[in-house]
Amino acid sequence: MRVDAFDFDLPEEHIALRPAEPRDAARMLVVRPGGAPELSDLKVRDLPDFITANDALVVNDTRVIPAALEGVRERDGGSAVRIEANLIKRLDASRWQAFAKPGKRLRVGDRVRFGGEGSACLLGALDAQIAAKEDDGSVILAFDLAGTALDEAVTAVGHMPIPPYIAARRAEDDRDRADYQTLFARVSGSVAAPTASLHFTPELMARIAATGASMHTVTLHVGAGTFLPVKAEDTTGHRMHAEWGEVSADTAAALNAVKAKGGRIFTVGSTSTRLIESATGEDGTIRPFVGETDIFITPGYRFRAVDGMLTNFHLPRSTLVMLVAAFVGHEAQKRAYAHAIAAGYRFYSYGDACLLLPEGGP
C-alpha cells in the first residue's frame, strides 16, 4: 500500500506542547465504523462508559528514562566539542546505541563526558567511549559504568527525551519529568512514553475499577523509532524497528479467561496493542512472550485479540497512523482525522485521544 495514502496536513497550532490538566480532561474522539453516529466528541474521563465488568484493559508499565544526554568530546590533542546524545536502544549492561550530534565530529575511540560540573550525579560525570559508528548515523556508546550504576547515573545527568516536534518548539523542563511519565510507569527502559496512558488519573482508575473490568499490565520499551516517518514509497518496503516486550504467563492466562467468557480486550496505546498481537497465535490464544517484536500492522491485518483501543492522534506517514487505519479501516481513519483537525483536537504525545471500537461495538 502506498505510504502517501497516510499523509495529511496538520496545522502547527494543533500540536500539543503540554498535556491537558487534569490529564483525563483531554478530549476523546470515539470512532465506531458503521455506527450511528460514527464519530462522537467526548472526554477521556468518559472511557468507563464503554467498559463492562466482563472486559479487560491492558496498559504498558514501561518507564521513560531521561535518555537525552549533554556532554563534551575529549580527544588527545583535540579541542573539546559539545555533544548531544539521545539513547535509543540498550545493547547490554554497559552499551547503548544512540543518535549523537554533531556526529561528524565523533570517531571511534573518542571519549565523551556527560554531565560534569553542576551535575546531580554523585560521580560528577558519566563517561563513555565511542565504540562504533553505524550505517544509520547512530553511534555505540560504551559507558564506564554498567547495570544499576549506569541506570542511576543516566537518571542523574540525563534529561527527559521529549519528542522532536515538541523540542523544536520549546525546551525540555522540569515539568516534563512528571508530564512525560505515565501513572503505570514501573519498568525502566523506554526512550519515549506510551502516550495513551498519559491520560490516566487516580480518579479515572477508580471509575474504571467501579465497572468491574480487570486491569492488566504488559511491558514494551518504546524506542525512538516510534517518531520516524516511513520513508519507503510502499509499506512493503518499510523495515519496522524492533522493541523489547514482555507478556507474563499470568497476564496471558487472565486475558484468555476474559475472552473465553465473552469479554473484550481494550488496549491502552499502540504499544500494548502491538505487544498483545505479537503474543497471540492464529487461533486467538494469547501466550507468554519475552523478546523483541517488530510487528508492522497495516490495513488488511486481521486482529487476533484486541477488541478496542485507546490511542492518541499520530504523525502523518507513521506506522502508528497505519495501525489505526488497520483497526478501523482506512476510510474511517481518514474521516476521523479530518474531523479531529476541523474540531480543533490536539495531536501527538501530549494531545488528545481517540477510542477505536470495532464495527458493531458498544
Swiss-Prot record:
One GO CC annotation: cytoplasm
Keyword Protein transport included in the entry's annotation: no
Pathway stated in the Swiss-Prot or TrEMBL entry: tRNA modification; tRNA-queuosine biosynthesis
Coiled coil regions, renumbered to chain: none
Pfam families: Queuosine_synth
Chief localisation class: cytoplasm
EC number(s) on file: 2.4.99.17
Disulfides per UniProt: none
UniProt catalytic activity: 7-aminomethyl-7-carbaguanosine(34) in tRNA + S-adenosyl-L-methionine = epoxyqueuosine(34) in tRNA + adenine + L-methionine + 2 H(+)
GO MF terms held by the record: S-adenosylmethionine:tRNA ribosyltransferase-isomerase activity
Biological process terms in GO annotation: queuosine biosynthetic process; tRNA wobble guanine modification
Keyword vocabulary terms for this entry: Cytoplasm, Queuosine biosynthesis, S-adenosyl-L-methionine, Transferase
Cellular compartment(s): Cytoplasm
Quaternary organization: Monomer.
Biological role: Transfers and isomerizes the ribose moiety from AdoMet to the 7-aminomethyl group of 7-deazaguanine (preQ1-tRNA) to give epoxyqueuosine (oQ-tRNA).
Family: Belongs to the QueA family.
Protein name: S-adenosylmethionine:tRNA ribosyltransferase-isomerase
Species the sequence originates in: Xanthobacter autotrophicus (strain ATCC BAA-1158 / Py2)
